[in-house]
Protein backbone atom coordinates (compact mmCIF):
# COMPACT_ATOMS: atom_id res chain seq x y z
CA UNK A 1 0.00 0.00 0.00
CA UNK A 2 1.10 3.57 -0.72
CA UNK A 3 -0.24 6.71 0.96
CA UNK A 4 -2.26 9.36 -0.87
CA UNK A 5 -2.40 13.02 0.08
CA UNK A 6 -4.66 15.89 -0.99
CA UNK A 7 -3.97 19.62 -1.19
CA UNK A 8 -7.52 20.65 -2.15
CA UNK A 9 -9.83 19.15 0.48
CA UNK A 10 -9.97 15.74 -1.24
CA UNK A 11 -11.08 16.93 -4.68
CA UNK A 12 -7.94 15.30 -6.03
CA UNK A 13 -5.19 13.02 -4.73
CA UNK A 14 -1.54 12.32 -5.36
CA UNK A 15 0.88 9.73 -4.06
CA UNK A 16 2.88 10.97 -1.10
CA UNK A 17 6.57 11.45 -1.85
CA UNK A 18 7.34 10.08 1.61
CA UNK A 19 5.40 6.90 0.91
CA UNK A 20 7.59 3.89 0.30
CA UNK A 21 4.69 1.44 0.43
CA UNK A 22 4.08 -1.20 3.05
CA UNK A 23 2.87 -4.77 3.28
CA UNK A 24 -0.75 -5.11 4.40
CA UNK A 25 -3.29 -7.85 4.91
CA UNK A 26 -5.64 -7.20 2.00
CA UNK A 27 -9.29 -7.38 3.09
CA UNK A 28 -10.59 -5.05 0.40
CA UNK A 29 -9.96 -6.64 -3.01
CA UNK A 30 -12.22 -9.09 -4.85
CA UNK A 31 -9.55 -11.77 -5.18
CA UNK A 32 -11.99 -14.37 -3.85
CA UNK A 33 -10.14 -17.53 -4.89
CA UNK A 34 -6.61 -16.12 -4.72
CA UNK A 35 -5.92 -16.64 -8.44
CA UNK A 36 -4.57 -13.07 -8.81
CA UNK A 37 -1.10 -14.17 -7.75
CA UNK A 38 2.38 -13.41 -9.00
CA UNK A 39 3.44 -17.02 -9.51
CA UNK A 40 1.88 -20.42 -10.03
CA UNK A 41 0.11 -22.24 -12.86
CA UNK A 42 -2.10 -19.32 -13.90
CA UNK A 43 0.81 -16.91 -14.13
CA UNK A 44 2.96 -19.38 -16.06
CA UNK A 45 0.21 -20.08 -18.58
CA UNK A 46 -0.49 -16.34 -18.98
CA UNK A 47 3.20 -15.67 -19.70
CA UNK A 48 3.19 -18.48 -22.25
CA UNK A 49 0.14 -16.88 -23.91
CA UNK A 50 2.04 -13.58 -24.19
CA UNK A 51 4.92 -15.33 -25.94
CA UNK A 52 2.56 -17.09 -28.37
CA UNK A 53 -0.03 -14.37 -29.04
CA UNK A 54 1.51 -11.09 -27.89
CA UNK A 55 0.07 -8.55 -25.47
CA UNK A 56 -2.89 -7.36 -27.56
CA UNK A 57 -4.81 -8.11 -30.75
CA UNK A 58 -5.46 -4.45 -31.66
CA UNK A 59 -8.64 -5.43 -33.49
CA UNK A 60 -12.32 -6.04 -32.61
CA UNK A 61 -13.61 -9.59 -32.35
CA UNK A 62 -15.67 -9.29 -35.55
CA UNK A 63 -12.67 -8.24 -37.61
CA UNK A 64 -9.28 -9.83 -36.84
CA UNK A 65 -9.51 -10.08 -33.06
CA UNK A 66 -10.98 -13.56 -32.64
CA UNK A 67 -8.38 -16.27 -32.03
CA UNK A 68 -8.31 -19.86 -30.86
CA UNK A 69 -7.85 -18.70 -27.28
CA UNK A 70 -11.11 -16.70 -27.38
CA UNK A 71 -13.00 -19.68 -28.75
CA UNK A 72 -11.53 -21.89 -26.04
CA UNK A 73 -12.46 -19.32 -23.39
CA UNK A 74 -16.10 -19.15 -24.48
CA UNK A 75 -16.49 -22.91 -24.73
CA UNK A 76 -14.89 -23.26 -21.27
CA UNK A 77 -17.29 -20.70 -19.77
CA UNK A 78 -20.30 -22.50 -21.30
CA UNK A 79 -19.08 -25.85 -19.98
CA UNK A 80 -18.35 -24.39 -16.55
CA UNK A 81 -21.85 -22.91 -16.25
CA UNK A 82 -23.69 -25.84 -17.85
CA UNK A 83 -25.30 -23.80 -20.65
CA UNK A 84 -25.28 -23.99 -24.44
CA UNK A 85 -23.00 -21.07 -25.29
CA UNK A 86 -21.31 -17.93 -23.96
CA UNK A 87 -19.93 -14.63 -25.23
CA UNK A 88 -17.01 -12.84 -23.53
CA UNK A 89 -16.07 -9.16 -23.52
CA UNK A 90 -13.07 -7.24 -22.25
CA UNK A 91 -14.71 -5.12 -19.52
CA UNK A 92 -16.90 -6.29 -16.65
CA UNK A 93 -18.87 -3.04 -16.27
CA UNK A 94 -19.62 -2.94 -19.99
CA UNK A 95 -20.89 -6.52 -19.90
CA UNK A 96 -24.04 -5.19 -18.24
CA UNK A 97 -24.13 -1.65 -19.61
CA UNK A 98 -23.72 -2.50 -23.29
CA UNK A 99 -25.46 -5.88 -23.45
CA UNK A 100 -28.66 -5.04 -21.56
CA UNK A 101 -29.81 -2.55 -24.26
CA UNK A 102 -29.30 -5.28 -26.88
CA UNK A 103 -31.51 -7.72 -24.95
CA UNK A 104 -34.12 -5.31 -23.55
CA UNK A 105 -35.76 -2.49 -25.53
CA UNK A 106 -38.62 0.02 -25.52
CA UNK A 107 -41.97 -1.58 -24.80
CA UNK A 108 -40.42 -4.05 -22.35
CA UNK A 109 -41.01 -4.11 -18.60
CA UNK A 110 -38.10 -4.66 -16.22
CA UNK A 111 -38.56 -5.55 -12.55
CA UNK A 112 -35.26 -4.60 -10.91
CA UNK A 113 -33.93 -5.04 -7.37
CA UNK A 114 -33.47 -1.67 -5.66
CA UNK A 115 -29.83 -2.48 -4.85
CA UNK A 116 -28.73 -3.62 -8.29
CA UNK A 117 -25.28 -2.48 -9.40
CA UNK A 118 -24.68 0.82 -11.20
CA UNK A 119 -23.75 -1.02 -14.40
CA UNK A 120 -27.21 -2.62 -14.45
CA UNK A 121 -28.96 0.68 -13.74
CA UNK A 122 -27.06 2.41 -16.55
CA UNK A 123 -27.73 -0.44 -18.96
CA UNK A 124 -31.46 -0.33 -18.21
CA UNK A 125 -31.52 3.44 -18.76
CA UNK A 126 -29.88 2.98 -22.15
CA UNK A 127 -32.39 0.28 -23.08
CA UNK A 128 -35.38 2.64 -22.98
CA UNK A 129 -37.47 0.02 -21.19
CA UNK A 130 -39.92 0.78 -18.38
CA UNK A 131 -38.28 -0.08 -15.06
CA UNK A 132 -40.15 -0.89 -11.84
CA UNK A 133 -38.13 -1.38 -8.66
CA UNK A 134 -38.86 -3.86 -5.87
CA UNK A 135 -37.57 -3.89 -2.29
CA UNK A 136 -34.22 -5.59 -1.89
CA UNK A 137 -34.48 -9.38 -2.02
CA UNK A 138 -38.20 -9.22 -1.15
CA UNK A 139 -39.88 -11.78 -3.40
CA UNK A 140 -43.34 -10.94 -2.08
CA UNK A 141 -42.91 -7.32 -3.15
CA UNK A 142 -41.35 -8.44 -6.43
CA UNK A 143 -44.46 -10.47 -7.29
CA UNK A 144 -46.76 -7.63 -6.23
CA UNK A 145 -44.93 -5.10 -8.45
CA UNK A 146 -44.75 -7.58 -11.33
CA UNK A 147 -48.44 -8.49 -11.20
CA UNK A 148 -49.54 -4.86 -10.87
CA UNK A 149 -47.53 -3.72 -13.90
CA UNK A 150 -48.64 -6.65 -16.04
CA UNK A 151 -52.29 -5.89 -15.26
CA UNK A 152 -51.91 -2.17 -16.04
CA UNK A 153 -49.90 -2.71 -19.22
CA UNK A 154 -47.83 0.00 -20.88
CA UNK A 155 -48.41 3.34 -19.05
CA UNK A 156 -49.10 5.30 -22.26
CA UNK A 157 -51.09 2.86 -24.36
CA UNK A 158 -52.30 0.27 -21.86
CA UNK A 159 -51.16 -2.42 -24.28
CA UNK A 160 -49.42 -5.61 -23.12
CA UNK A 161 -45.65 -5.49 -22.67
CA UNK A 162 -43.44 -6.85 -25.44
CA UNK A 163 -41.42 -8.80 -22.89
CA UNK A 164 -41.07 -8.84 -19.10
CA UNK A 165 -37.67 -9.21 -17.41
CA UNK A 166 -36.64 -9.75 -13.79
CA UNK A 167 -33.09 -8.46 -13.13
CA UNK A 168 -31.24 -9.50 -9.96
CA UNK A 169 -27.73 -10.19 -8.67
CA UNK A 170 -26.39 -13.40 -7.16
CA UNK A 171 -24.44 -11.79 -4.31
CA UNK A 172 -24.97 -8.08 -3.70
CA UNK A 173 -21.62 -6.35 -3.44
CA UNK A 174 -22.51 -3.79 -0.76
CA UNK A 175 -24.90 -5.91 1.32
CA UNK A 176 -23.34 -9.36 1.20
CA UNK A 177 -26.85 -10.76 0.73
CA UNK A 178 -27.70 -13.73 -1.49
CA UNK A 179 -30.58 -13.69 -3.97
CA UNK A 180 -33.59 -15.89 -3.21
CA UNK A 181 -33.22 -17.59 -6.56
CA UNK A 182 -35.56 -20.61 -6.26
CA UNK A 183 -38.51 -18.36 -5.38
CA UNK A 184 -37.67 -15.89 -8.15
CA UNK A 185 -37.46 -18.69 -10.72
CA UNK A 186 -40.90 -19.89 -9.58
CA UNK A 187 -42.32 -16.36 -10.04
CA UNK A 188 -40.63 -16.02 -13.42
CA UNK A 189 -42.24 -19.23 -14.65
CA UNK A 190 -45.63 -18.32 -13.20
CA UNK A 191 -45.79 -15.01 -15.08
CA UNK A 192 -43.85 -15.95 -18.22
CA UNK A 193 -41.02 -13.50 -17.53
CA UNK A 194 -37.35 -13.69 -18.47
CA UNK A 195 -34.67 -13.79 -15.75
CA UNK A 196 -31.36 -11.89 -15.98
CA UNK A 197 -28.91 -12.92 -13.24
CA UNK A 198 -25.72 -10.95 -12.53
CA UNK A 199 -23.21 -13.35 -10.96
CA UNK A 200 -20.26 -10.96 -10.78
CA UNK A 201 -19.65 -11.64 -7.08
CA UNK A 202 -20.96 -15.21 -6.93
CA UNK A 203 -19.51 -17.15 -9.87
CA UNK A 204 -16.47 -19.04 -8.65
CA UNK A 205 -17.12 -17.97 -5.07
CA UNK A 206 -20.42 -19.72 -4.32
CA UNK A 207 -21.72 -23.26 -4.55
CA UNK A 208 -20.06 -26.61 -3.74
CA UNK A 209 -18.53 -26.70 -7.25
CA UNK A 210 -17.87 -22.96 -7.48
CA UNK A 211 -20.39 -22.52 -10.28
CA UNK A 212 -22.19 -19.63 -8.59
CA UNK A 213 -25.64 -19.10 -7.11
CA UNK A 214 -27.31 -21.60 -9.44
CA UNK A 215 -24.90 -24.23 -8.13
CA UNK A 216 -25.38 -23.00 -4.54
CA UNK A 217 -29.11 -23.78 -4.77
CA UNK A 218 -28.55 -26.89 -6.95
CA UNK A 219 -30.81 -25.53 -9.71
CA UNK A 220 -30.92 -26.09 -13.46
CA UNK A 221 -28.85 -23.32 -15.12
CA UNK A 222 -31.24 -23.33 -18.09
CA UNK A 223 -33.96 -21.99 -15.76
CA UNK A 224 -32.04 -18.69 -15.84
CA UNK A 225 -32.51 -17.12 -19.26
CA UNK A 226 -29.47 -14.82 -19.18
CA UNK A 227 -26.45 -15.51 -16.98
CA UNK A 228 -23.98 -12.66 -16.61
CA UNK A 229 -20.71 -12.66 -14.71
CA UNK A 230 -17.27 -11.08 -14.56
CA UNK A 231 -13.73 -12.43 -14.53
CA UNK A 232 -12.45 -9.62 -12.30
CA UNK A 233 -13.28 -11.28 -8.99
CA UNK A 234 -12.95 -15.03 -8.56
CA UNK A 235 -10.75 -15.56 -11.62
CA UNK A 236 -8.22 -12.79 -11.05
CA UNK A 237 -8.49 -11.37 -14.57
CA UNK A 238 -10.58 -8.81 -16.45
CA UNK A 239 -13.73 -8.76 -18.55
CA UNK A 240 -17.04 -10.56 -18.32
CA UNK A 241 -19.46 -12.93 -20.02
CA UNK A 242 -23.08 -13.43 -21.02
CA UNK A 243 -24.17 -17.08 -21.13
CA UNK A 244 -27.36 -18.87 -22.07
CA UNK A 245 -29.00 -20.39 -25.12
CA UNK A 246 -27.22 -20.67 -28.47
CA UNK A 247 -29.82 -18.38 -30.07
CA UNK A 248 -29.20 -15.62 -27.50
CA UNK A 249 -25.42 -15.77 -27.81
CA UNK A 250 -25.46 -15.86 -31.61
CA UNK A 251 -27.69 -12.77 -31.58
CA UNK A 252 -25.28 -10.94 -29.23
CA UNK A 253 -22.28 -11.84 -31.39
CA UNK A 254 -23.94 -9.94 -34.20
CA UNK A 255 -25.45 -7.04 -32.23
CA UNK A 256 -23.65 -6.48 -28.92
CA UNK A 257 -21.75 -3.18 -28.80
CA UNK A 258 -19.49 -4.71 -26.14
CA UNK A 259 -18.48 -7.39 -28.63
CA UNK A 260 -18.55 -5.67 -32.03
CA UNK A 261 -16.64 -2.44 -31.37
CA UNK A 262 -14.00 -2.83 -28.60
CA UNK A 263 -10.61 -4.41 -29.12
CA UNK A 264 -10.54 -8.11 -28.31
CA UNK A 265 -9.59 -9.34 -24.85
CA UNK A 266 -5.81 -9.79 -24.63
CA UNK A 267 -4.43 -13.33 -24.75
CA UNK A 268 -2.86 -13.43 -21.25
CA UNK A 269 -6.13 -12.24 -19.68
CA UNK A 270 -8.13 -14.86 -21.57
CA UNK A 271 -5.62 -17.55 -20.64
CA UNK A 272 -5.78 -16.53 -16.97
CA UNK A 273 -9.54 -17.17 -16.99
CA UNK A 274 -9.21 -20.48 -18.85
CA UNK A 275 -6.55 -21.79 -16.48
CA UNK A 276 -8.32 -20.76 -13.28
CA UNK A 277 -11.71 -22.02 -14.50
CA UNK A 278 -10.30 -25.39 -15.56
CA UNK A 279 -8.48 -25.62 -12.24
CA UNK A 280 -11.85 -25.39 -10.49
CA UNK A 281 -13.42 -27.95 -12.83
CA UNK A 282 -10.61 -30.50 -13.03
CA UNK A 283 -7.81 -29.56 -10.64
CA UNK A 284 -7.10 -28.28 -7.16
CA UNK A 285 -9.02 -25.06 -7.68
CA UNK A 286 -12.07 -26.62 -6.03
CA UNK A 287 -10.07 -26.65 -2.78
CA UNK A 288 -9.91 -22.86 -3.00
CA UNK A 289 -13.71 -22.71 -3.16
CA UNK A 290 -13.95 -24.70 0.08
CA UNK A 291 -11.21 -22.57 1.68
CA UNK A 292 -13.04 -19.36 0.79
CA UNK A 293 -16.26 -20.67 2.36
CA UNK A 294 -14.36 -21.62 5.53
CA UNK A 295 -12.60 -18.25 5.76
CA UNK A 296 -15.81 -16.29 5.15
CA UNK A 297 -17.85 -18.07 7.80
CA UNK A 298 -15.06 -17.91 10.40
CA UNK A 299 -14.35 -14.20 9.83
CA UNK A 300 -18.04 -13.25 9.91
CA UNK A 301 -18.79 -15.20 13.09
CA UNK A 302 -15.75 -13.80 14.91
CA UNK A 303 -16.83 -10.23 14.09
CA UNK A 304 -20.36 -10.95 15.33
CA UNK A 305 -18.91 -12.43 18.49
CA UNK A 306 -16.97 -9.20 19.11
CA UNK A 307 -20.18 -7.15 19.03
CA UNK A 308 -20.08 -5.60 15.56
CA UNK A 309 -23.23 -5.31 13.45
CA UNK A 310 -22.60 -7.42 10.36
CA UNK A 311 -24.82 -7.49 7.27
CA UNK A 312 -25.22 -10.24 4.69
CA UNK A 313 -25.66 -13.98 4.39
CA UNK A 314 -23.51 -16.38 6.40
CA UNK A 315 -22.14 -17.98 3.22
CA UNK A 316 -21.29 -14.74 1.43
CA UNK A 317 -17.63 -13.74 0.91
CA UNK A 318 -18.71 -10.07 1.12
CA UNK A 319 -18.88 -9.00 4.78
CA UNK A 320 -20.13 -5.45 5.56
CA UNK A 321 -19.44 -4.03 9.04
CA UNK A 322 -21.81 -1.19 9.93
CA UNK A 323 -20.21 2.11 11.00
CA UNK A 324 -23.32 4.30 10.51
CA UNK A 325 -21.59 7.69 10.87
CA UNK A 326 -19.75 9.16 7.83
CA UNK A 327 -16.89 10.51 9.94
CA UNK A 328 -16.06 7.04 11.20
CA UNK A 329 -15.47 5.64 7.71
CA UNK A 330 -12.20 7.51 7.28
CA UNK A 331 -11.19 6.96 10.90
CA UNK A 332 -11.78 3.20 10.68
CA UNK A 333 -10.00 2.73 7.35
CA UNK A 334 -6.97 4.83 8.34
CA UNK A 335 -6.66 3.24 11.77
CA UNK A 336 -6.75 -0.25 10.25
CA UNK A 337 -4.23 0.81 7.62
CA UNK A 338 -1.93 2.18 10.32
CA UNK A 339 -1.84 -1.39 11.68
CA UNK A 340 -1.25 -2.88 8.21
CA UNK A 341 -4.80 -4.03 7.47
CA UNK A 342 -6.15 -2.70 4.16
CA UNK A 343 -9.92 -2.44 3.91
CA UNK A 344 -12.58 -0.40 2.11
CA UNK A 345 -14.92 2.21 3.57
CA UNK A 346 -18.23 2.72 1.79
CA UNK A 347 -20.63 5.65 2.11
CA UNK A 348 -23.24 7.62 0.22
CA UNK A 349 -24.22 7.31 -2.64
CA UNK A 350 -23.10 3.67 -2.72
CA UNK A 351 -25.10 3.13 0.48
CA UNK A 352 -27.79 5.04 2.35
CA UNK A 353 -26.60 8.07 4.34
CA UNK A 354 -27.41 6.26 7.58
CA UNK A 355 -25.76 2.96 6.64
CA UNK A 356 -22.09 3.79 6.13
CA UNK A 357 -19.91 0.74 6.48
CA UNK A 358 -16.59 -0.98 6.07
CA UNK A 359 -16.67 -3.81 3.56
CA UNK A 360 -14.44 -6.85 3.85
CA UNK A 361 -13.91 -9.28 0.98
CA UNK A 362 -12.52 -12.64 1.96
CA UNK A 363 -10.11 -14.70 -0.11
CA UNK A 364 -9.00 -18.31 -0.28
CA UNK A 365 -5.50 -16.82 -0.15
CA UNK A 366 -5.98 -15.73 3.46
CA UNK A 367 -4.46 -18.07 6.03
CA UNK A 368 -5.93 -18.50 9.50
CA UNK A 369 -2.95 -16.61 10.91
CA UNK A 370 -3.66 -13.64 8.63
CA UNK A 371 -7.35 -13.65 9.54
CA UNK A 372 -6.67 -13.87 13.27
CA UNK A 373 -4.14 -11.02 13.08
CA UNK A 374 -6.62 -8.86 11.17
CA UNK A 375 -9.41 -9.71 13.61
CA UNK A 376 -7.28 -8.69 16.58
CA UNK A 377 -6.58 -5.32 14.96
CA UNK A 378 -10.24 -4.78 14.00
CA UNK A 379 -11.25 -5.67 17.54
CA UNK A 380 -8.92 -3.01 18.99
CA UNK A 381 -9.98 -0.41 16.41
CA UNK A 382 -13.62 -1.18 17.19
CA UNK A 383 -13.04 -0.45 20.87
CA UNK A 384 -11.04 2.68 20.08
CA UNK A 385 -13.74 4.13 17.79
CA UNK A 386 -16.65 2.79 19.85
CA UNK A 387 -18.36 1.08 16.89
CA UNK A 388 -19.43 -2.20 18.49
CA UNK A 389 -23.11 -1.32 18.23
CA UNK A 390 -24.68 -4.75 18.56
CA UNK A 391 -26.84 -5.14 21.67
CA UNK A 392 -26.39 -8.88 21.63
CA UNK A 393 -23.11 -10.64 21.03
CA UNK A 394 -23.65 -13.76 18.98
CA UNK A 395 -21.65 -16.86 19.88
CA UNK A 396 -20.93 -15.32 23.31
CA UNK A 397 -18.58 -17.52 25.32
CA UNK A 398 -18.20 -20.02 22.48
CA UNK A 399 -15.09 -20.95 20.53
CA UNK A 400 -15.56 -20.30 16.83
CA UNK A 401 -14.28 -23.29 14.90
CA UNK A 402 -12.17 -22.63 11.81
Could you tell me what each predicted segment is?
Residues 1-55, 193:
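N-terminal "arm"/small-domain region of PLP-dependent enzymes with the aminotransferase-like
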Residues 1-12, 151-159, 384-402:
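Eukaryotic N-terminal low-complexity, Ser/Thr- and Lys/Arg-rich leader segments
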Residues 1-5, 286-300, 304-340, 348-350, ...:
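Conserved PLP-binding catalytic core of the aspartate aminotransferase-like
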Residues 30, 132, 136-197:
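Active-site phosphate-binding strand-loop segment of PLP-dependent enzymes
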Residues 43-92:
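Conserved N-terminal alpha-helix of the aminotransferase class I/II PLP-enzyme fold
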Residues 99-118:
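Conserved PLP-anchoring active-site segment centered on the Schiff-base-forming lysine
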Residues 191-194, 201, 206-306, 311-315, ...:
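Active-site C-terminal subdomain of aminotransferase-like
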Amino acid sequence: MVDRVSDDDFWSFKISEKSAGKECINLGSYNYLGFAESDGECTNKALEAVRQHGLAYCSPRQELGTSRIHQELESTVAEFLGVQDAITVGMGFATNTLNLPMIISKGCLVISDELNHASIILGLRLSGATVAVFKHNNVEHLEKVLRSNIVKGHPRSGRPWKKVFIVVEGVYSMEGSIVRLPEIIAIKKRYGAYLYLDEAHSVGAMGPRGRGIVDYYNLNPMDVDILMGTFTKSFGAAGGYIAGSSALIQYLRLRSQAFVYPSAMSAPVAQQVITSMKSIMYGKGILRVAQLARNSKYFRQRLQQMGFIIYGHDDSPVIPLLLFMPAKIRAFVLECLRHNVATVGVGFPATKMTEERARFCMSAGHTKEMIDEALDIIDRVGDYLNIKYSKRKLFHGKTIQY
